[in-house]
Regions:
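Glycine-rich anion-binding loops of enzyme active sites
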Residues: 51, 58, 91-176, 278
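Small-aliphatic-rich amphipathic alpha-helix that forms the alpha element of a beta-alpha
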Residues: 70-94, 115-123, 192, 210-216
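Active-site-proximal betaalpha loop/short-helix elements
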Residues: 104, 181-248, 280, 289
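Short, conserved charged micro-motifs
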Residues: 107-108, 154, 258-265
Length: 301
């Protein structure tokens, strides 16, 4: 399909990414994972040493409303990128921030946004080491984040196998309760799952279970069976919202059945675990009509 022959609304986010990156080439001796995972992964100098790169943007009117707390806007900008590191089991190292801002923006508001950034950076030991400012029609922040795995491999989306059980952390569907501004990235949980070699595949739920589980299945080349009754809905959320609203930032991961007892016995975090299905060798996605969309930046909903 020629790019000019289709609109973004029809192509969708996944289609656009494929169109733009289909001809990219990487050096496998240096690059473990590129387009298609939560972060890009480069091989480090030592054995089992990896560097992870992530860039993520928050835009006024898309990721936050004009009247939201500026401290929480800054917090969310970094927390989103941290969640992607968590999804691969990595520890954060440093970040640079690009700020796009209208020339009549309040300096007090900008100062509060950066206070929120600094607070969460301190909490998760992220060094804020630079950035850029640019005039823009509307406020946005872009975070470029560096992480690392030392002594263990990051968890990719592509490692799930038929028979692996599907787990999520926490509860889903709390976007309307402002959890998208207040969530905690599951860094400790993700790193533990990677170090213990328990998760066979993993990602974070940024666009919703309805969009992200099919992505993980496609990356692994298999399908899935969902137990809809087991999906953990946040208080006040419907099943449809839990599946499709997005911005949960919980971990979605798969586990070999032989490791599930170890997972449950050694899981020492307050974050609850929920088994919601199993990866399968047959296509059963068509039996799941509630997997409607998830969030897509471009498709009409």
């Amino acid at each position: 399909m020629k790019p000019a022959a289709v609109s973004l609304a029809k192509l969708g986010e996944n289609g656009l990414l494929h169109l733009l990156t289909a001809r990219w080439k990487t050096d496998p001796s240096r690059v473990l994972a590129g387009v298609g995972d939560d972060c890009a992964v480069l091989r480090g100098e030592g054995k089992n040493s990896y560097l992870l790169f992530k860039t993520d943007a928050v835009v006024e009117g898309v990721h936050f409303k004009p009247g939201e707390s500026p401290e929480l806007i800054g917090r969310k900008a970094l927390a989103r990128a941290l969640s992607d590191l968590a999804a691969m089991g990595a520890a954060p190292v440093a970040a640079v921030i690009t700020l796009g801002v209208p020339k009549d923006e309040s300096v007090r508001r900008l100062s509060a946004i950066y206070s929120g950034l600094k607070r969460i950076a301190k909490k998760y030991s992220v060094n804020l080491v630079g950035g850029e400012t640019v005039r823009a029609k509307q406020l946005f922040l872009n975070v470029a984040l560096l992480g690392e795995c030392r002594g263990y491999r990051p968890v990719l989306r592509s490692g799930a196998r038929a028979g692996d059980l599907i787990f999520v952390t926490g509860r889903l569907g709390a976007t309307q309760a402002r959890r998208h501004l207040l969530f905690e990235p599951r860094l400790a949980e993700g790193e533990w799952l990677a170090r213990q070699k328990i998760a066979t595949a993993m990602m974070d739920l940024s666009d919703g279970l309805g969009a992200d589980l099919p992505r993980l299945a496609r990356a692994s080349g298999i399908f899935f069976h969902l137990d809809f009754a087991a999906i953990p809905c946040a208080r006040g959320a419907t099943l449809h919202e839990a599946i499709n609203d997005g911005e949960d930032y919980e971990l979605l991961f798969t586990v070999n059945p032989s490791r599930t007892n170890t997972l449950r016995k050694k899981w020492s975090f307050a974050t609850p675990l929920h088994c919601i299905g199993v990866m399968g060798a047959r296509d059963v996605e068509s039996r799941a009509p509630l997997l409607a969309h998830g969030f897509d930046h471009f498709k009409q909903r």
